[in-house]
A protein has these predicted regions:
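Short, active-site-adjacent cap segments at secondary-structure transitions
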Residues: 57-59, 82-83, 143-145
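Domain-level recognition of soluble alpha/beta enzyme cores
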Residues: 154-181
Length: 182
């Protein structure tokens, strides 16, 4: 079974949409979330390999988790953040909420005209998913949402947004999740 893990909480005092801006590292809470989820993964799941986004927050999460799992980690771009709305990057959440695209993003983000569609995100992640077994994918919220939406043929893109260091996986064609209590 392949499992998706969203990275831990990020230190972001200015509430910036950071996407791929360098330097956004895990907060103290994010570190604790990753430590907790590592214990859960070791206890309850068979993980043979870790595939992680190369972005700092995901790399840090994977390294913390791997202190307990002790598996091979591969950092690859195919599991990175959704290509998204470029003019949002570097803006505050408040500024993003004022944009014309924000309402579409909230209601039905599959209708957005962006550099990378959510379906394109699904396709790049699905290739990895189909070609691997017992892998922990450490990635980002919209990447996980895109994958689950299309893989499960859902009618609601916003059904289950993973919070920081939550797990999501598919079992018998059904979404299963573990909500990190930290």
């Amino acid at each position: 079974m392949n499992i998706f893990l969203r990275h831990g909480e990020v230190k972001n005092p200015k509430d910036i949409l950071y996407y791929n801006i360098p330097g956004y590292e895990l907060s103290e809470k994010g570190i604790k979330q990753a430590e907790h989820i590592a214990e859960k993964l070791k206890k309850d799941f068979k993980i043979e390999k870790i595939i992680s986004s190369p972005l700092l927050r995901a790399r840090q999460t994977s390294q913390i988790v791997n202190k307990m799992l002790k598996k091979e980690i591969t950092f690859i771009d195919e599991i990175t953040e959704w290509g998204g709305i470029k003019n949002w990057i570097g803006n505050t959440t408040f500024e993003v909420q004022q944009s014309k695209e924000f309402e579409i993003y909230i209601n039905d983000p599959t209708e957005l005209n962006t550099n990378e569609s959510f379906f394109d995100t699904f396709k790049r992640v699905n290739k990895l998913y189909e070609n691997n077994k017992n892998v922990l994918f450490i990635t980002h919220q919209d990447t996980i949402r895109s994958f689950m939406f299309y893989k499960l043929e859902s009618d609601n893109f916003n059904m289950d947004k993973p919070s920081h260091c939550d797990l999501q996986y598919i079992e018998k064609n059904d979404l299963k999740k573990y909500i990190n209590p930290v």
